[in-house]
């Protein structure tokens, strides 16, 4: 459970940073990022969701570390994280 909390925290942090940097309110970006983070590879993040950003070597090392945390999650836990974030983002739409 500790790894999934860390993964969620880092994902939310990256989302906030990217959101502030672009000045966009882009929930789709975050969902794409999270989906790729949970079921894809770091390379897929760099080529897709983060493709327009300059990802430095330290950030790439952090993504590799996240991948090792993610690999330890059971598939049902990954799915539940996605469901939770969809719920949170959906509640923001209604606010």
From Swiss-Prot:
Annotated family: Belongs to the secretoglobin family.
GO cellular component, as recorded: extracellular region
CDD domains: Secretoglobin
Entry annotated with the keyword Secreted: yes
Organism in which the protein naturally occurs: Homo sapiens
Signal peptide per UniProt: 1-23
Entry protein name: Secretoglobin family 1C member 2
Listed PANTHER family: SECRETOGLOBIN FAMILY 1 MEMBER, SECRETOGLOBIN FAMILY 1C MEMBER 1-RELATED
Record flagged with keyword Isomerase: no
């Amino acid at each position: 459970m500790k790894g999934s909390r860390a993964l969620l925290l880092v994902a939310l942090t990256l989302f906030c940073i990217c959101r502030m940097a672009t000045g966009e309110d882009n929930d789709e970006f975050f969902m794409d990022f999270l989906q790729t983070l949970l079921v894809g590879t770091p390379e897929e993040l760099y080529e897709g969701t983060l493709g327009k950003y300059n990802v430095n070597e330290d950030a790439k090392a952090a993504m590799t570390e996240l991948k090792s945390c993610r690999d330890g999650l059971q598939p049902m836990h990954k799915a539940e994280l996605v469901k939770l974030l969809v719920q949170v983002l959906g509640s923001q739409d209604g606010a």
